[in-house]
């Protein structure tokens, strides 16, 4: 069995992994594939390094950090994996309600926001953007939610915004 680390079911990695494994199952009879829901990029790199999965999707910036032991992976380099392909470009977006009054990242000060699932590429990108905007954790109330949870809480007005790093077509 080949275990494929995707991400949460609400993002693009999970459906991509399912489509990929369906195609591979048709092409390579006798190989069993299992898509694993994970927190995302950083988690997949850790799971690959720990031999819990054999294949995983990760953002290029986090692959670089893991390889060199910096940023999210400052505690040490990760090894035991290699890049196979570049899938598609991704962009980090900030999602808000139309009536929120939030027009730029600077408007997030004092707001409750989801920075993505813990160990996800979205979390890393959100923290980078907040840092550049001069918004440390003391100035925003952050929650670690996957996309589905964040969208639900945004609709219920329990959070003010959420970060989403996903394929450009999202």
Language model segments and positions:
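Residues that line or immediately flank small-molecule/substrate-binding pockets and catalytic motifs
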Residues: 60, 144, 166
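A structural signal for short loop-to-beta-strand junctions that line the ligand-binding cleft
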Residues: 74-87, 92
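Bilobed "Venus flytrap"/periplasmic-binding protein-like clamshell domains
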Residues: 2-27, 31-32, 90-156
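Alpha-to-beta junction loops
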Residues: 31, 49-58, 111-113, 155-164
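Soluble extramembrane regions of membrane proteins in the secretory/endomembrane system
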Residues: 84, 165-169
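Pocket-flanking alpha-helical
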Residues: 21-22, 34-75, 149-153, 169-170
């Amino acid at each position: 069995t080949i275990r494929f680390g995707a991400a949460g079911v609400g993002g693009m990695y999970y459906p991509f992994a399912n489509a990929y494994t369906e195609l591979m199952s048709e092409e390579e009879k006798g190989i069993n594939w299992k898509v694993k829901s994970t927190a995302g990029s950083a988690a997949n790199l850790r799971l690959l390094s720990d031999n819990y999965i054999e294949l995983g999707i990760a953002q290029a910036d986090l692959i670089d950090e893991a390889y060199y032991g910096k940023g999210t992976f400052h505690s040490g380099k990760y090894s035991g994996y290699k890049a196979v392909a570049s899938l598609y470009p991704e962009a980090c977006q900030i999602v808000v309600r139309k009536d929120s009054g939030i027009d730029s990242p600077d408007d997030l000060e004092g707001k409750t926001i989801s920075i993505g699932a813990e160990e996800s590429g979205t979390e890393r990108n959100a923290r980078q953007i907040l840092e550049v905007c001069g918004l440390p954790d003391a100035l925003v109330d952050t929650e670690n939610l996957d996309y589905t949870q964040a969208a639900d809480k945004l609709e219920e007005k329990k959070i003010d915004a959420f970060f989403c790093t996903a394929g450009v077509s999202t």
